[in-house]
Structure formats: structure tokens, C-alpha cells
A protein has these predicted regions:
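Active-site-adjacent C-terminal substructures of enzyme catalytic domains
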Residues: 44, 136-200
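Hydrophobic residues within beta-strands of alpha/beta enzymes
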Residues: 5-7, 71, 159
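Metal-coordinating catalytic core of metallo-dependent amide/deamination hydrolases
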Residues: 12-142
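Conserved beta-strand edge residues that scaffold enzyme active sites
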Residues: 6, 11-13, 77, 143-144, ...
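A generic structural signal for ordered alpha-helices
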Residues: 7, 37, 104, 108, ...
Length: 200
């Protein structure tokens, strides 16, 4: 039996504790494996945020780790993909992130800028890393056929959580596997109001 532990390398939120927790989590998993305490094989699924300039530096120490077997390329900037409605994003995250309206506006503007100016190169570098390692890669929160076509052209094999029927259909047509979340199927809909897994 195999488990893929999905851990974030980079984040679109100002939550440094996620990065701080990464090394202890991976060390703990390795110690448990070495002690024979795990009942199945644990491999690493690297969830890579393309809007974060720290993603690749955080990932680099683990590129030779034999547990690294899968990579997702994520873009959680508002205005597209998971969060096409910026106002919904603002209202959803203001309380969660304990920000004022002005602080949230600055946060949104920064993420939108990162998505436009930084993400394309970070994404290209991650694709190169994935191919160099010979591991499968997944796109994430594909919203449009163009998102899926980009993923296909980069050699990605899986579309995680397509957010629209158009993206899911294009993924199927291009030979990418669609993956939806169990909670979405149980609830009958996405947390963000995107397409229900039951429709696919």
C-alpha cells in the first residue's frame, strides 16, 4: 500500500509556519519509516505554488530525496482558477487572515502582480525540475481549456480539481486524468462554489 503525503512548498498566504513545519514533518516521517512504524510506503507529493518566489529554494534541498515522486503546480492568485471572483476571495479570507480591508487589497494586488510577473518563470523552472527528476506532474484548479492545454504542452499528466466543466472536458480530450476531492463529492460542491465532483 502506498500513501502520498501532500506537503506545500511555497504558499500564496502569509503563513510562514507552513514552511517552518516542512523539515520537521519530513524528518518525522523518515524516522517513523526507519523505525518500522509505518504500515505502508510513504512518498512525497510536492505542492508547488508558482506565485511564491521561495517555492524553488524551499524545494531544492529535497530534489535528491527518493521519496519525492509527484509534483503539483498551483496558482492560487485571486481572479482566476480557484478564485475567479476577487470580491468573494476578499470576503472569504479577510477574517481568516485577520486583515483589514486595506491590508487585503494590498495582499490581493501583490498576488495578482506575482501571478503576472513571477509565476510564468517559476512554473517553467518547476516543469524543468519535474522532467529532470522523471516524476509525473499535475496542473491544479484548471479553469479554462487554455489552462489545460498549457498543462498538456508541459507534459503534465493529471488535472487536479478542474473548476469548470469546460476544463474537465478538455482535460479528458487531451488525455490528462481528472482528479476531484472526496469532500467535494460528499458535500455535492466545491468550497469555492466551483463545479461539483458529482457532475464529472
Amino acid at each position: 500500500t502506498t500513501v502520498f503525503d501532500s506537503l506545500a512548498f511555497g504558499t500564496s498566504f502569509r503563513r510562514p509556519e507552513r514552511k517552518a513545519a516542512l523539515a520537521p514533518l519530513l524528518q518525522g516521517l523518515q524516522e517513523a519509516a526507519d523505525a518500522g512504524a509505518l504500515r505502508c510506503d510513504h512518498f512525497l507529493h510536492a505542492r508547488c505554488e508558482v506565485t511564491d518566489p521561495e517555492t524553488i529554494p524551499v524545494l531544492k534541498p529535497y530534489l535528491d530525496d527518493p521519496r519525492l515522486r509527484f509534483m503539483s503546480l498551483m496558482n492560487h492568485a485571486p481572479g482566476q482558477r480557484q478564485s475567479p471572483d476577487i470580491e468573494v476571495y476578499r470576503q472569504r479570507h479577510m477574517a481568516d487572515m485577520n486583515m483589514s480591508a486595506e491590508e487585503m487589497d494590498k495582499h490581493v494586488a501583490e498576488l495578482v502582480w506575482r501571478a503576472a510577473e513571477l509565476a510564468p518563470q517559476i512554473r517553467a523552472d518547476l516543469v524543468e525540475i519535474g522532467h529532470g527528476l522523471g516524476i509525473p506532474m499535475a496542473s491544479h484548479d484548471d479553469e479554462t481549456p487554455e489552462h489545460v492545454a498549457e498543462a498538456g504542452s508541459e507534459g503534465q499528466v493529471l488535472s487536479e480539481f478542474p473548476t469548470t466543466m469546460a476544463a474537465a472536458r478538455t482535460s479528458h480530450e487531451l488525455g490528462l486524468v481528472n482528479l476531484m476531492g472526496g469532500p467535494n463529492a460528499v458535500r455535492g460542491g466545491s468550497n469555492y462554489g466551483n463545479i461539483s465532483a458529482r457532475m464529472l
